[in-house]
Design a protein with these regions (language model features):
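Iron-sulfur cluster-binding cysteine motifs and their immediate structural context
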Residues: 196-197, 202-224, 230, 234-251
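Short beta-strand or tight-loop elements
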Residues: 193
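Local sequence-structure signature of Cys/Sec-based thiol-disulfide redox active-site neighborhoods
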Residues: 8-13, 197
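FMN-binding flavodoxin-like domain, especially the glycine-rich phosphate-binding loop
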Residues: 2-8, 16-22, 27-42, 50-64, ...
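Conserved active-site "lid/cap" helical segment
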Residues: 46
Length: 292
């Protein structure tokens, strides 16, 4: 491709790594088309008070994990800090553990960007392995990743060719998104406040340094959790001795946790898991998996 913009800035939030994996897929695809790419974690920008230098990018991208059919609170907090976009071309992508309702309406994210002067021309859902409720089987995890690679390449080509692709949002889906998102924001604070560490905690401090909202502290030799949690699950799944657990909603935690890159690179794991013949819960995944 020739004549397309060459500098891309991708700003993303990733709790347990799935949105980062999609970000890496998109960054690689842009680079294959001759673009220069910066991929920047928004939680690191927020924690370190780093200003957004949007003027250096021809195109800006924003990625987030779906929380209760919407972007998490920390993502919207970041959007409020953006400089004026001056009608900059923008794309949005989101990762979800299920294709149900396309991960919710994009109206609220699109509106927040529009108010800052950014024009959203492309939106995409990427279904990735779930990080709550159900531990997907390795073949499905690999199939979802490979599908994300294919969809990522298509998204990048459409962006560079100025082919618009916006998610169709119904009034119902937008209402559901707004309602569930409000409940999730409250629930996240409750969930975080009620985390605790078991006796296997070795006070390594990884959870403290990794927390995107500085919700975890060490006080008098003990790990303490507060009420700024964004429900990303990062502390639970990145704890080396698996010492962090919720007092309530324990059924949300997947055991054992999966290593995405290890599964993807394992040649013994096949990726042909869901087909048109699939029945049961995962049947509704087939339409997503068969789309470009």
């Amino acid at each position: 491709m020739t004549g397309h913009p060459r500098t891309i800035g991708i700003f993303y939030f990733s709790g347990t790594g799935n949105t980062k994996a999609v970000t890496d897929i998109l960054a690689t695809s842009f680079k294959e088309q001759g673009c220069a790419v910066d991929a920047i974690a928004i939680d690191e920008m927020l924690k370190n008070n780093i200003n957004v230098e949007m003027g250096k990018y021809d195109i800006a991208g924003f990625g987030y994990p779906v929380h209760a059919f919407n972007a998490p609170r920390i993502f919207f907090e970041f959007l409020t800090l953006l400089p004026d976009g001056d009608q900059k071309k923008t794309f949005v992508f989101k990762s979800s553990g299920d294709p149900f309702m396309n991960g919710g309406s994009t109206v609220l994210v699109r509106k927040a960007l529009h108010e800052k002067g950014y024009i959203v021309s492309s939106e995409r859902l990427f279904v990735m392995p779930a990080n709550v409720f159900i531990r997907y089987r390795d073949p499905l995890i690999k199939q979802l990743f490979n599908t994300a690679v294919r969809r990522g390449k298509t998204m990048v080509k459409e962006i560079l060719l100025d082919v618009p692709r916006l998610q169709k949002n119904t009034l119902f889906s937008t209402y559901i998104t707004a309602a569930f998102s409000a409940l999730e924001s409250f629930g996240a604070r409750f969930f975080g406040k009620n985390l605790y560490v078991t006796d296997s905690c070795n006070l390594c401090g990884i959870c403290i340094s990794n927390c995107p909202t500085n919700n975890i502290t060490k006080q008098k030799g003990h790990i303490r959790f507060h009420s700024k949690c964004t429900f990303c699950m990062r502390c639970i799944y990145s704890c080396p001795p698996n010492a962090i657990s919720p007092r309530f909603l324990r059924f949300l935690v997947i055991k054992p946790w999966y290593n995405l890159q290890k599964i993807v690179s394992d040649t013994t794991v096949k990726d042909f898991h869901i087909t048109h013949k699939t029945k049961g819960f995962f049947r509704h995944f087939y339409r997503y998996l068969s789309e470009q």
